[in-house]
Amino acid sequence: MTTARPVKTRNEGQWALGDREPLNDTEKIKLADGPLNVRERIINVYAKQGFDSIDKSDLRGRFRWMGLYTQREQGYDGSWTGDDNTDKIEAKYFMMRVRSDGKAMSAHTMRTLGQISTEFARDTADISDRENLQLHWIRIEDVPEIWRRLESVGLQTTEACGDCPRGIHGSPLAGDSLDEVLDPSPAIEEIVRRSLNNPEYANLPRKYKTAVSGLQDVSHETHDVAFVGVEHPEHGPGLDLWVGGGLSTNPMLAQRLSVWVPLDEVPDVWEAVTQLFRDYGYRRLRAKARLKFLVKDWGIEKFREILEQEYLNRRLIDGPAPAPVKHTIDHVGVQKIKNGLNAVGVAPIAGRVSGTTLSAVADLMEQVGSDRARWTPFQKLVILDVPDDKVDELVTGLDALGLPSRPSSWRKNTMACTGIEFCKLSFAETRVRTQTLVPELERRLADVDAQLDAPISVHLNGCPNSCARIQVADIGFKGQWIDNGDGTSVEGFQVHLGGGLGEQSGFGRKLRQHKVTSEELGDYIDRVTRKYLEGRNDGETFASWALRADEEELR
């Protein structure tokens, strides 16, 4: 009789288990020098000596912690995308990500962003679906001056990227919404105060995304950690804790810990979850290093047990689940807020604006007496504190800038990532393409728009990373370089259908072996929308129909 040899557990680089040896190149870079230290080199060395002086481990590693990615060299289509061609497609310019952390921006702040864009970024500016503003064509020589101007108005790019707590999602109407359970702004401010520029949290296993909102308006199910407003029958208003969300190539929705957290304890609980991720998170394979993989392997009960016993030293209060929302809360349009004034939400196509536009928005804000505005998680802009007698004036002025507050459903519900215009990871054009796709859909589907009981969301992403949240859209497109049917390859997309959040949370379905070329996007959306209207049952949503429809109907 032979004794079975014990199975050796693979070293996943979990610090809490004593596995401190770096197991991939990024972990080695972080160990060699703390990522936050690169700021001084940017200011004192690279900005003075130019792009060619930048050390590669800083350029492709630590720069991310300063909100900087090199952008794609112009003229290289999706066939060039891949690690083997990084040297060829990497331009000597940067995308700079400016985080907002749910803060309201004054007219002066908005104008400062506009001026930075026009002076240093060739008038580019994109509102991301993480409530950030992204600028392009940034030269390393200009970074210190841009930082100086941003920081003078309370903004920063620090840790807008990297293996660290990214910018925090907060409600665009935090403290203002008539429907919020509570205003969590103090908790967000305290989390940022504790975490930003803190070496204790600057070396997490992977990116770490947080949402804190008194409303379900921040896509909380797709975050690593999220706190959502909920009313406890005994304890009153507080927040419901979710962990383990994230999309990309292994999408997972966050799960409830079934606990109720009072507002003043949110920063402590957030730190405990973050420390747990730092210590127990996987650091061997980058593709398996997000918190969601740990939550999946442990299960939610073990996660809560370790959180309470090892990090909080107390038991959390059991809490009720918030009722899931039926429709996306995007804050587009005009609505009353708590102070009796109005919020006006507008919809640029897929978040694309410009420095010139932002400066003009600042002028309009001052003209109508508003001094607060926020980005949204759906690539929109909301202007707050607008008096009743100034709403029409503001709406007219914003319309003239291409920022409608009464947009078509297609404009309102289309999102896109950066795409091949600037992103080295992309296989397809996305944001630029939406600028013509949305008007095309408005024209082609005008005859059936009134038949849509609820709008159909369309999300375009240039690669599998799902920055534009394609798996939770009614119609999601994932960029690929595809066979054109004649032996050649062209830019195209894999189709995802029937995803959603809230009451219909799920990832929908992927059509097997069905790809759509970029030129066919309008045709495809037109075709599948009309088939839905022909084949739906009474009151049936697009997502529900898409999940049950024959695959042939969806092609």
Swiss-Prot record:
Gene3D superfamilies: 3.90.480.20, Sulfite Reductase Hemoprotein, domain 1 (3.30.413.10). The keyword Nucleus does not apply. Transmembrane segments: none annotated. [4Fe-4S] cluster binds at residues 417, 423, 463, 467. It catalyses: hydrogen sulfide + 6 oxidized [2Fe-2S]-[ferredoxin] + 3 H2O = sulfite + 6 reduced [2Fe-2S]-[ferredoxin] + 7 H(+). Its EC number is 1.8.7.1. Binds 1 siroheme per subunit. Binds 1 [4Fe-4S] cluster per subunit. Its cofactor is siroheme; [4Fe-4S] cluster. Belongs to the nitrite and sulfite reductase 4Fe-4S domain family. This is Sulfite reductase [ferredoxin] 1. It comes from Mycolicibacterium paratuberculosis (strain ATCC BAA-968 / K-10) (Mycobacterium paratuberculosis).
